[in-house]
Amino acid sequence: MEAEKDSGRRLRAIDRQRYDENEDLSDVEEIVSVRGFSLEEKLRSQLYQGDFVHAMEGKDFNYEYVQREALRVPLVFRDKDGLGIKMPDPDFTVRDVKLLVGSRRLVDVMDVNTQKGTEMSMSQFVRYYETPEAQRDKLYNVISLEFSHTKLEHLVKRPTVVDLVDWVDNMWPQHLKEKQTEATNALAEMKYPKVKKYCLMSVKGCFTDFHIDFGGTSVWYHVFRGGKIFWLIPPTLHNLALYEEWVLSGKQSDIFLGDRVERCQRIELKQGYTFFIPSGWIHAVYTPVDSLVFGGNILHSFNVPMQLRIYEIEDRTRVQPKFRYPFYYEMCWYVLERYVYCVTQRSYLTQEYQRELMLIDAPRKTSVDGFSSDSWLDMEEESCEQQPQEEEEEEEDKEEEGDGADKTPKPPTDDPTSPTSTPPEDQDSTGKKPKAPAIRFLKRTLSNESEESVKSTSMPTDDPKTPTGSPATEVSTKWTHLTEFELKGLKALVEKLESLPENKKCVPEGIEDPQALLEGVKNVLKEHVDDDPTLAITGVPVVSWPKKTAKNRVVGRPKGKLGPASAVKLAANRTTAGARRRRTRCRKCEACLRTECGECHFCKDMKKFGGPGRMKQSCIMRQCIAPVLPHTAVCLVCGEAGKEDTVEEEEGKFNLMLMECSICNEIIHPGCLKIKESEGVVNDELPNCWECPKCNHAGKTGKQKRGPGFKYASNLPGSLLKEQKMNRDNKEGQEPAKRRSECEEAPRRRSDEHPKKVPADGILRRKSDDVHLRRKRKYEKPQELSGRKRASSLQTSPGSSSHLSPRPPLGSSLSPWWRSSLTYFQQQLKPGKEDKLFRKKRRSWKNAEDRLSLANKPLRRFKQEPEDDLPEAPPKTRESDQSRSSSPTAGPSTEGAEGPEEKKKVKMRRKRRLVNKELSKELSKELNHEIQKTESTLAHESQQPIKSEPESENDEPKRPLSHCERPHRFSKGLNGTPRELRHSLGPGLRSPPRVMSRPPPSASPPKCIQMERHVIRPPPISPPPDSLPLDDGAAHVMHREVWMAVFSYLSHRDLCVCMRVCRTWNRWCCDKRLWTRIDLNRCKSITPLMLSGIIRRQPVSLDLSWTNISKKQLSWLINRLPGLRDLVLSGCSWIAVSALCSSSCPLLRTLDVQWVEGLKDAQMRDLLSPPTDNRPGQMDNRSKLRNIVELRLAGLDITDVSLRLIIRHMPLLSKLQLSYCNHINDQSINLLTAVGTTTRDSLTEVNLSDCNKVTDLCLSFFKRCGNICHIDLRYCKQVTKEGCEQFIAEMSVSVQFGQVEEKLLQKLS
């Protein structure tokens, strides 16, 4: 042998032949499967002239027909009118199917010649389908593309009768259907029998041999394009026996089954025909032209014996599970349970299933986090306070998203036989009256007749036909008759399920006691054996689910994580504001009237567009602009609804109108208020909304409320805002002189009116003309705006009624502290300029109109001014509003007589408060505009040096601005810190925003801007000066680095004081070395000004814990903080934290996501996985959190799945915080310290306090960690002190550990 090896001889290796059952043997089968009959002959033959198919019209095909005829004969409808069918547009093609179900969706394709199945992607099949007929090598046929839960689903609607009889819609638990997310028919992911909607795509020449649809299902079949030819064989016992023999013979290709039976019918279906094939009918199909067909399969209660017979045939012919009806016997159990429940009101479902299906009252918890401050503005399609007609309209809106159960008509009776009038959980067999909470829940969930239903369930009446063994409370006041077909079906189901062996009964988990259920069905059959078949034909299904409404959800679900303080305060307000209600659609604005856009993230989530349907939100473009109070809202004081329609006097109308406070959320009549010394602030942007006098008197302020659709209103075609702008522009073009004269006469006219009538007149005139309530300058065209500015600057004169005031000086409208802090900036103003600004503002305050409106009015209007309008406190009537549209600020400049001194003080105090508020809104919106429009500009330009002599905004440009020039409002940055950085700076040391030096731009970019061919980047910012210039021009003896050494010893509060000294110190004190850590912990509101301040300081550590920061804000921040290393986001929402999943996330060292709402294993996977939004050139496929050293995960609902991700993606992890994680156990620690894991050697500190599943065993796993120094097991109930002492003793050989506290182990130095 050695010689043979050395000789270099190589023997040939012989591989053993391996056989694969999936091996393609199509070449062999092509020879074997040669058809033994001529298909062309069968198409021309006159032998198949049976008359089984009945032609009908859609209007005659209703549920009453089903109860009478039981769907036993084939039906053809030459027109789909009256059937309730919905189909795509006529130009819909197979290519559109691919777009809607996904080009990568795998479909089962049948090779017609070999009758062998294979798989293709939709993209591949569409390419084949569009290939010319002459170039097709083979004939492929798609007959099993189920498209539920895809975008195609809601373009196709089944016949109404099919929805009413389908077991899937009416028997299968609805909450299981809602859990279905997988669009394919993978059995492992299937939550219900997914056979409702199929798309069949066949090319010319395709032939499907004789077959019976799986499970004995009936079939609806609509020829959308092309045509079909059917051969039909009735399911007699003889024919079924022949069929079974034919299938088992294996000679299907040799024998045409239609020739073996007594009678067979051939029928041709043309384009637009709808066909119904009953259960058990044997049929073959030929495609004469390329066709596109939509159809579906159903099981129903009117031919159950045939359905069971076909299922048994499938058992005997050994049909593969892939081609059978899924969950067949499970469905049978649910059918029995639903019939028993709807007839006797006794449920055999588990308690959990009953709660899910609204059959009993779910336990409701009261939580301080139950309501968010914006919940009164939540606009959902199924609002819980809709009027009955509004509910119908909303159900029509939701019709395409719902299933057949949602379309099931409710029985006309008000008795317990109605599935919607169900007994509560605590109602027992003795007829005990339900508890009050259950009654309240029923009242919330039932319709207008619910009171009678509750009475009927709580006080049952005796009936002679009480089902045997049924409690007295379950007796219906009106007997429900079952058809003979249903009775036969129920009997067949009971016999079949009883005959099954235990291992094949397939009892679903929702059935609590299957044997008791069978007995209950037998009792029902005994009681209904004498039912009148005529009375059973009612046209109404016996079985249907209770309609789910929005009341099943928590009404005030918070949108984001609230801080504890705000949550508690909100709950207190909730208890006092009993009349608070969720607002509903106005149904008048353009947003309410339009259809879904199909493009926004809410639309993409909807089931009708192929999404999972989890968000339950309406389209962004359909969010109401002006949501109204629901009809159930009543006054908190008198308990009555709004009665403004009962009077004609305008002042009386307002006093009887319901107003909702945007701060305390109380709904009240203004006339019912006892507080008269203060004034309310009416919100023009939202109907029936104000800041009530009580909150205003207490000095509370709230965020301006608007309808959720207001910010999208300008995008709506034909929106109200666009119409207002066009109308306003037309009026300005036609009547400029008339408006000016009206403005001049307005103060005189109003000063003569009675003071008490001023509020009502002004309010209602402006309310009636909605055009003036929502005037927004940012929707104007840029050329109109610039032209108007030029005209107003030329026309300004001391005597004119309308003067230009681009922005009031900051010091004039702010508090004394703010004015003192602005001294430095005011000194930079030119001598005459400051006086001119103050004179103008004083004149506008002292005129007669202002005194009347501020001193005598109980109410005032406030509006959010657009970015280029000024905050205005003096209210204007319609005439002054019209004049204001021609200039940024319009108002009478003539001074009136001085009023009483007290009124003057009150007026000035309110004026300052309002201007402060408006100014803050102005600056916030300006920065929001910058965030959206120029993301990178602000970070660079905000650090540009401040000019030695800034100009006041009152200076107009000396030449008109061309359209291509767009001045930048933030080109100088924001000097000082935002006032909201209160935790770092303190209440008394907030630096002011400086006066803007250039006029604001229009909101939309000028149309004549020509796009550059190359990227234009901003110039680099100039470095801060090295020395401090003095008044005489010389430089201070101490240079910048010396000053920086001094500044490093100052607190952030002191730095803010220094920033107000001069421009040089302002820039020096903003150096990032002085702001390595910024703490905004528990800050109530994160504003754009605060974000800009953070960006300017470039911190290394940022604490945003327990704030309401949004995803957009956090994304904007992390894009501009490349040096950020420590980020604290504890208590925020997952929506905000998900901003870290982007490729722009900095390489953090410390990440704190403790108590983040909604952060679970799936979210951890998104957080730790490599980002998918890499920019061109970014080839790094590693996690952006790979440098994490310290990770805090306390209070999260995570499991070992997340720990595996941590081990994989965080090789440097040293400190891990897992306290209050209830799923962490000893196995989790074993996983962290296993051989080969990076955490075994890198972990130094682990916090497992309050992890109740951790035991002493975990300590033995920690022995593997070579660098462990700190183990916190405090408050772990299953960890003992003895176990800790044993760990210390065993570790003492190599490392000395001690118990600093009980169960707190620390390495001793």
Curated annotation (Swiss-Prot):
GO terms for biological process: embryonic camera-type eye morphogenesis; forebrain development; fourth ventricle development; hindbrain development; initiation of neural tube closure; lateral ventricle development; midbrain development; midbrain-hindbrain boundary morphogenesis. A zinc finger (CXXC-type) spans 579-625. It comes from the Eukaryota. LRR repeats lie at residues 1106-1127, 1129-1155, 1195-1220, 1221-1250, 1251-1275, 1276-1309. Zn(2+) 1 binds at C586, C589, C592, C624. Signal peptide: none annotated. Substrate binds at T208, K228. Residues 378-403 have a biased composition (Acidic residues). Zn(2+) binds at C635, C638, C661, C664, H669, C672, C692, C695. Residues 467-476, 883-892, 934-946 have a biased composition (Polar residues). Histone demethylase activity is inhibited by fumarate. The modification Phosphothreonine is found at T466. GO terms for molecular function: histone demethylase activity; histone H3K36 demethylase activity; histone H3K36me/H3K36me2 demethylase activity; RNA polymerase II cis-regulatory region sequence-specific DNA binding; rRNA binding; unmethylated CpG binding; zinc ion binding. A zinc finger (PHD-type) spans 632-698. Zn(2+) 2 binds at C597, C600, C603, C619. Residues 147-315 form the JmjC domain. Its EC number is 1.14.11.27. Binds 1 Fe(2+) ion per subunit. Residues 905-914 have a biased composition (Basic residues). Residues 415-424, 792-816 have a biased composition (Low complexity). Fe cation binds at H211, D213, H283. Gene3D superfamilies: 1.20.58.1360, Cupin, Ribonuclease Inhibitor, Zinc/RING finger domain, C3HC4 (zinc finger). Histone demethylase that demethylates 'Lys-4' and 'Lys-36' of histone H3, thereby playing a central role in histone code. Preferentially demethylates trimethylated H3 'Lys-4' and dimethylated H3 'Lys-36' residue while it has weak or no activity for mono- and tri-methylated H3 'Lys-36'. Preferentially binds the transcribed region of ribosomal RNA and represses the transcription of ribosomal RNA genes which inhibits cell growth and proliferation. May also serve as a substrate-recognition component of the SCF (SKP1-CUL1-F-box protein)-type E3 ubiquitin ligase complex. Belongs to the JHDM1 histone demethylase family. This is Lysine-specific demethylase 2B. The lineage of its organism: Eukaryota, Metazoa, Chordata, Craniata, Vertebrata.
